[in-house]
Amino acid sequence: MGFSPFLDECRAEGLWPIGPSCNKIISFGVYTFFIVVNFIVLCIPNSNSANNNYRRMTDDDASSTSKLTISKILSICTIFAVICQSIFYFCFTFYFHPYTHLLLAFCVSKLFFWILSLCSFSKWRNQPSTPISLAFAFSAALLIHCIPLTDWKKYFEPTSKNRGDLTFYIIELALVTVVFFFTIVTGLFNFSGCSSRESAWNNLSKKVVTVAPYIWPTKSISLQLRVVFCLFLLIIGRLINVSLPILSKWIVDELATPDTFQYSLLFLATFLKFLQGNGAMGGFLNTVRTYLWIPIQQYTTRELEVELFKHLHSLSLRWHLSRKTGQVLRVMDRGTSSVNNILNYILFNVVPTIADIVIAVIFFFSAFNAYFGLIVFGTMALYLTVTISITEWRTQYIREANEKDNATSAIATDSLINYETVKYYGNEEFEVNRFKNAIESYQVTEWKTQASLAFLNCLQNAIIGIGMIGGSVFVVYMIVHEKTLTVGDYVLFTTYLLQLYTPLNFFGTIYRVIQKAFVDMENMFDLMNDEVEVKDLPHALPYTDPRGTISVKNLTFEYNTGLPVIKNISFEIGNGQTVALVGSSGSGKSTLIRLLFRLFESTEGSIEFDGIDVRNYTMHSLRQQIGIVPQDTVLFNDTIMYNIRFGRPDASDEEVIEAAKAAMIHEKITSLPEGYATMVGERGLKLSGGEKQRVAIARTILKKPQFIFLDEATSALDTPTERAIQKCLEKLCKSRTGVVVAHRLSTVVNADLILVLDKGIILERGNHKELLAQQGTYASMWEAQIAEQRAKSIELGEELP
């Protein structure tokens, strides 16, 4: 008694040759082994069994992996479906088949295997990768499900009582393949040291939700109709793909009886081929679809680029100071094009290809028999698994190549922008070598991507070749020996498979392009997800009818935590008054100007305009009331007219000219060959420093703001021009509130209030006479500048003003 009947049944069946019963013995052994392994692993606490990759993860990665991804949810659902299928199979088997101990052991072990697998998977769902025990368990499960294929003729005999077994087998094979794909392919490569971020498919649902508004043209009904019609053309294309091989079979079979040959079949096949073209290219349907899709693609690009550009302008000055412009533009360019690539390839290549595969499997199962369906299904499953697995592994090289490409672009951009500096120090060779080293570093990573691509192509061709040979041999066998198929069926099979494999040959390339696009899009999302530091509050109101008062109360600001640049500053400015900020470099003068303009948010304290905190005003309305001339004036690479009019884009030419006259640059402009149409060059490099600042002053005058902020606005001017512009600025600020940052104290002697800053605090305050009387820091600075100016005047033989 005991195990004797079971052992007797196993001895009777034997392990060779492999057959349905032998499969049960092997499966029972494999299932039992992994039941023990999974049970032991299931009893191990999480803290002791977490792999090194998981321990090395950052907090951000850990929080991201704690969420259930789509692949994990699908894996759990599929494993649960396998459990349900096993229960149904258990009931079916003991209802239609005679009871044996071996059959009972097989069914029970399989059921417990999948139940423990589900428990193990649920326990380790927060890991970035599949636990090794589950990886081997699911791999073994997939292998033992392939054992019956070695004796397919006996096992799948259509007339035998195994018809029900065949149905359950096909369902379970499909489910196990899905489980293997989602648990092994999407997680196994993390064991090689890749973080969970390495997969471009991570956070796929979040990416889709973010991009969806730019894909569906919500603003245009006509574009929506174009999308619907393009989808309709895709459906027509799938029907044609099924019809053409069938027509080929009919034509070949009709040729066996030439007297009754129907030429209409030939004409119909030719017409359908004209509509279909060469796979995904060249056909009439694809030409029409491409024509219809162009405006949709342009809509997506336009909406996404505009939104991203708008977002970049909404980010704080702190963000822009910490980024390289060339790198940002490169990410923006690749990211926007990647969205169109993803949309085109998924909608017009991936979805149709998968649909064709599903239709082909169903067609061969129904029109031929299960053998043909399994050949197509097995080849497709193996091809897709290998393609996706190796491509996922290649993602790390693609991402690394992108980073090095960004770095190369940033080096080139910075070097060309600073062309003049490079020439000053004779560092052309140094810059060329730096650029060369960046390219060489990029090409090392590029070689890895190309070499791994060649390896993948080799495997893909091998899989497709094996599938074609196996299918063709089987068709010939059915024609020659079984006499159940005709020559037309051979033509149908080969035509259909060649038609199916043609787009599949490009599937690997398409998948790689899509994955690279996801990586590019991921970098773009990093930009789009950067938090806007300075933004309008929900209840912010427009700043209208300004009275011109500013109140700074206990203001503190720090760029880096714990290192304040401005420390507890307080002062008030009345309407029409001018406050001057003086002090040594790095004392916080320019930072205070930026805080008043709300380029940064204060760390502590408040800034009030007309008694209301600036955070209660909308930024646009507040900044419209402020005119600022920065210390380092940067102009657009456009005309002088454009740069001055930038202060108020709706200003007329006459108003622009009046502003230029007020800034004392009109005569200089008119002396140029092209006058106001003169191009100023990149960053305004064609103009001198003084000319650039006068252009900046002109556009500030044109803006007609209530508040004037001057950040050493006359520092680059010669003495006569400085005196003339100073009078102009004094006149401009007479009825307006002004804040002036000055290095030359002679330019602020008439200020209503002078604040002497040092290391972010106010050392002294008062007007010019009061500060001189204090005999403090300001008086020392004044005496030093007077002595310096007197020495220069004596040297040049000029009279001291």
Curated annotation (Swiss-Prot):
GO cellular component terms, alphabetically, are:
early endosome; late endosome; membrane; recycling endosome; vacuolar membrane
Coiled-coil segments: none
Localization recorded for this chain is: Vacuole membrane; Early endosome; Late endosome; Recycling endosome
The scientific name of the source species is Caenorhabditis elegans
| Gene Ontology molecular function, alphabetical | ABC-type heme transporter activity; ATP binding; ATP hydrolysis activity; cadmium ion transmembrane transporter activity; heme binding
Q: Does the keyword Nucleotide-binding apply?
A: yes
Q: Which GO terms describe its biological process?
A: cadmium ion transmembrane transport; cellular detoxification of cadmium ion; detoxification of cadmium ion; detoxification of copper ion; heme transport; response to cadmium ion; transmembrane transport
Knockout mutant characteristics: RNAi-mediated knockdown causes hypersensitivity to Cd(2+) and exhibit Cd(2+)-elicited changes in cellular morphology. Even at the lowest Cd(2+) concentrations they arrest in the early larval stages and eventually die. The intestinal epithelial cells of hmt-1 RNAi worms upon exposure to toxic levels of Cd(2+) elaborate punctate refractive inclusions within the vicinity of the nucleus.
Source domain of life is Eukaryota
**Annotated keywords:** ATP-binding, Endosome, Membrane, Nucleotide-binding, Transmembrane, Transmembrane helix, Transport, Vacuole
Q: Name one Pfam family in it.
A: ABC_tran
Residues in the Cytoplasmic compartment per record: 46-75, 123-129, 189-226, 286-341, 391-461, 511-801
* Positions that bind ATP: 583-590
Found, by tissue, as follows:
Expressed in coelomocytes, as well as in head and tail neurons, and in the intestinal cells.
Entry annotated with the keyword Membrane: yes
> The ABC transporter domain covers which part of the protein?
550-784
Q: Which SMART domains match?
A: AAA
Q: Report the record's disulfide bonds.
A: none
Its protein name is Heavy metal tolerance factor 1
All residue ranges annotated as the ABC transmembrane type-1 domain in the record: 227-516
Q: Which residues lie on this side of the membrane: Lumenal?
A: 1-24, 97-101, 151-167, 248-264, 365-371, 483-489
What the protein does comes down to: May play a pivotal role in the detoxification of heavy metals such as cadmium but do not depend exclusively on phytochelatins (PC) synthesis.
Would you identify the family this protein belongs to, as annotated? Answer: Belongs to the ABC transporter superfamily. ABCB family. Heavy Metal importer (TC 3.A.1.210) subfamily.
TM ranges: 25-45, 76-96, 102-122, 130-150, 168-188, 227-247, 265-285, 342-364, 372-390, 462-482, 490-510
Q: Topology relative to the membrane, per the entry?
A: Multi-pass membrane protein
